[in-house]
Amino acid sequence: MQNGFIKVAAAVPTVRVADCAFNVQHIENMMAQADGQGIEIICFPELSITAYTCQDLFSQQLLLDEAESSLLKLIEFSRNLNVTALVGVPIAYNSMLFNCAAVIQRGKIHGLVPKTYLPNYKEFYEKRWFTSSEALGEGAELRFCGQTVSMSKYLLFQSSHCTFGVEICEDLWAPAPPSNYLALAGADLIFNLSASNELIGKAGYLKNLILNQSARLFAGYVYAGSGYGESTQDLVYSGRAFIAENGGLLAEGERFAMKEQLISSEIDVDRLRAERRLNTSFAGAIKIERVPLMRVVDLEAYTSNVPFTLTRPIDAHPFVPEGEALDERCEEIVCMQSEALARRIEHTHAKTVVIGISGGLDSTLALLVAVHAFDRLQRDRRGIVGITMPGFGTTDRTYTNATNLMKELGVTIREISIAPAVTQHFKDLGHDINVHDLTYENSQARERTQILMDAAGQMGGFVVGTGDLSELALGWATYNGDHMSMYGVNASIPKTLVKHLVAWAARNMADEASRETLLDIVATPISPELIPADENGNIKQVTEDLVGPYELHDFFLYYTLRFGFSPQKIYYLACRAFDGTSNGTAFAKEIILKWLRVFFRRFFTQQFKRSCLPDGPKVGSCSLSPRGDWRMPSDASSEAWLADLNVDDESQI
């Protein structure tokens, strides 16, 4: 395990029906393979020692004896391995036969979990051979494979890295799966040993069932189904295998492979535990559902020398979906923003809305949202007043794009230069206009806000804010300048997503003329334009040169807000996401570390700006509203977070 990740596997071995020696040999081979890959826990299918389709042979004492002796051989084989294995085996106890999962590690059975729900309908006849775990009550102690073992459905297994529970096949399909109670009792991971036969359409249904259960429980879910070698007398077993985490699919086996399969991935236990802490309904369910008392079985510490390798992809753009989902998400977001703005317009009986249009991404998105809201309200777009306020740093490119876009969208255009007022303000302050410091920059931002506020009052409207989530996180806004408005439609939209929203609007909301303007806005460097342009009239003050790439900062922000990860873990994930092999830009580790330190320093010092934010709609999983998702003291110290990144050897992080 490293940085909260645990490596697990689902195995689909080749079997021979009722040939326990053959089956155990193949299980041993796959256990050794898993151990060599640094896999901590491996799950095999239901009744994998005997094969599932033995039918009435389960009533033969010879088969039961062979199963026990073969399992004993497997236990001995595990003595020198680090991997924990879950294998399926029939176990006779008190004149009853139970379909069990045996949890074995380093030469010992740590527990037996019997199946609870026995299907006895259509093609299933399990009650003909097996007894439900309910017959055991809270469980039993029995002699098996030369040791005394607990057999109960109320078992949790605790390693040094996670807690897991076990259910078997039909248990998942039941109205009240055992995994519900196992998760509420503390299981981070659920392992399912299965032998579910194939039917038309069943595979998709099963996948959804697994994904939904993992999401409902905020759990990892590892499913191993019987495959090639099971009897095809009446049914077909395709060898389905899945590894899921909180509704997401990490790995999936090949159906009908006609060969053995070992799928593996790393489950983020830290992430699952963070989700459960944040969701108060999870803790509430523990009381409401009267979770039964579980016995916790401690496993030996995992001490493999195999270097940990993170194989699962880490999305460099967690706020931005890929493929067809991007267009769907963009449309949904714009609809949410415009719905919120429309409601505020109606509630305030506003005659107009006023937006400062700079020719940049944020003000463009706010304008597009306003247009969408007015169209839905069936109002004349001329009720949207776009004010462009050129200043000392305004370039021809952004000015032209601002005016062209307003013309193309048919909104009311006003142009008010801030230069005269700010120049007078500098004189009043005694500030040298040639000194381009914070006073020089902030005076311009506050003058623009004053114009917008007064114009809104003049025209019976309100100011629509343009600032986005990324700027709020970094405090990249002038206090009581662009930081302030009367309704902030972009307040929970990160910068990396803003660009995609404007590009989506260019494809779906624009005519040919406005499309060209929107695409040029997307291609324009991000800048507040508070410093004069260079000698060629180009933007001199590039935001990402000053505070760092938004691609990185949005990644840092997501894992800070969404899961509360430590700086070290965020650095670890970022190095994987931005190593050039994923969907992100390649950044050197020292660059990532540099901007991560900047992020945490600014995130803490700039909270005072977020403590007095205007209203604005939440549209995604992350928000910094002081009335909703993020309540943080403005004078909190960042020392512990920065110290977490201070190590002599950065490779240790």
Residue positions per predicted region:
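ATP/NTP-dependent adenylation/nucleotidyl-transfer catalytic domains that generate, transfer
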Residues: 18, 160, 219, 228-231, ...
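Enzyme catalytic cores with a strong preference for nitrogen-chemistry domains
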Residues: 1-354, 372-381, 413
